[in-house]
């Protein structure tokens, strides 16, 4: 393993076991940077939840407000992870094998830090409409104790969770079981 300089001593390159991986230059690389409001690979849309609980997009994050880790696997496929100051994953971006664009998966949190939406690549390409959110998004709801009580999967399948007084999950039921 090789490590980046600096006080955090973060790994920058790792090889699989055996000399063949090293001789072939087949390593897993990591580089560390910040987001940018001008460079396409480093743009990150700023999704949020409005006062009515609806998913909205507030443009892009300002430059240098998010940490970005750039990964390159043994086959030279590149992916990016964008994290906020609370180290929450906001965006997982994978470069297409043809290097002609990206597939983005966004993670949207509420004001107390609960994951509320997962926006897969199909939705980030389709745009935010009620129909596209219903069709493609993962949507999570929580109770006052921050327990997930409802999960909606792409296509509208709903899973409900019931907890006992000791906060243990007692039952989960999807919409097929409810019928």
Task: For each feature predicted by the language model, list its residue ranges.
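Beta-strand elements of repeat-based all-beta scaffolds
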Residues: 1-179
């Amino acid at each position: 393993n090789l490590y980046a300089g600096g006080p955090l001593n973060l790994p920058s390159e790792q090889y699989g076991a055996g000399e063949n991986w090293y001789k072939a230059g087949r390593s897993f690389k990591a580089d560390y940077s910040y987001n940018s409001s001008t460079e396409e690979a480093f743009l990150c849309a700023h999704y949020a939840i409005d006062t009515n609980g609806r998913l909205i997009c507030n443009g892009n994050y300002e430059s240098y407000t998010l940490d970005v880790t750039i990964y390159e696997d043994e086959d030279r496929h590149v992916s990016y992870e964008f994290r906020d100051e609370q180290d929450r994953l906001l965006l997982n971006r994978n470069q297409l094998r043809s290097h002609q664009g990206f597939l983005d998966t966004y993670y949207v949190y509420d004001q107390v830090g609960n994951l509320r939406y997962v926006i897969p690549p199909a939705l980030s390409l389709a745009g935010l409409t009620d129909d596209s959110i219903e069709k493609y998004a993962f949507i999570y709801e929580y109770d006052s104790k921050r327990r997930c009580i409802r999960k909606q999967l792409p296509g509208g399948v709903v899973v409900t969770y019931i907890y006992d007084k000791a906060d243990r999950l007692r039952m989960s039921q999807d919409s097929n079981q409810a019928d």
